[in-house]
Swiss-Prot record:
Pathway: Pyrimidine metabolism; UMP biosynthesis via de novo pathway; UMP from orotate: step 2/2. SUPFAM superfamilies: Ribulose-phoshate binding barrel. Belongs to the OMP decarboxylase family. Type 1 subfamily. This is Orotidine 5'-phosphate decarboxylase. InterPro entries: Aldolase_TIM, OMPdecase, OMPdecase_AS, OMPdecase_bac, OMPdeCOase_dom, RibuloseP-bd_barrel. GO terms for cellular component: cytosol. The gene is pyrF. One of its GO terms (biological process) is 'de novo' pyrimidine nucleobase biosynthetic process. One of its GO terms (molecular function) is orotidine-5'-phosphate decarboxylase activity. The lineage of its organism: Bacteria, Pseudomonadati, Pseudomonadota, Alphaproteobacteria, Hyphomicrobiales. It catalyses: orotidine 5'-phosphate + H(+) = UMP + CO2. The keyword Lyase applies. SMART domains: OMPdecase. It comes from Allorhizobium ampelinum (strain ATCC BAA-846 / DSM 112012 / S4) (Agrobacterium vitis (strain S4)).
Amino acid sequence: MDARNRLIVGLDVATVTEAEKLVSTLAEDVTFYKIGYQLAFAGGLEFARDLAQSGKKVFLDMKLLDIDNTVASAVENIVRMGMTMLTLHAYPKAMQAAVEAAQGSGLCLLGVTVLTSMDDQDLNDAGYQGDARSLVLKRAAQAKEKGMGGIVCSAQEAQAVRAILGSDMAIVTPGIRPAGSDAGDQKRVMTPADAIHAGSSHLVVGRPIVKADDPRAATQVILAEMQAAFT
């Protein structure tokens, strides 16, 4: 298994110019990129199309949630953009609408369970009863039932989630931090090797690469750790 197909670099930058520079710097070491709100609203959607047309894989992290018809219409347009992955919140009706809209397209739909920046207290403050792990597992089961391509969750829950999803669905894990690096605003973090061993199929890494003094060197260290974990 080639780790380059499983590392997703988060283009967490403010401008398309910065994103273009980073993609050029990382060259052939990276084949998969994530574009979220920050870049999307600064011309990043056109850039996402360009990346896909250049042969890169693009994970559009939009975390969709709306009425069924609106979600379905958005998914249909995103399919036409040539994206590889798309996130939506793991609510049953939204997932069902998205799956029906994406049918036959090859777009991998990912259900967002609980953000890796949140812990049990954050959920309690938001009015949820129970703990983050229980909610992640419940939403993972719902995502499987609705026919989603995978889910997004912390590597701390990946092993339990893998037992629910089986071997075919993707487990995409943000909050990845190489040993010794700053966790930043993430609360449920894990190293690349530990995340792979726990059952994650794809790792999303942003700041440890984007903010590194040498982004390409930082990427190569992470890829080597992932490759060793896969073998």
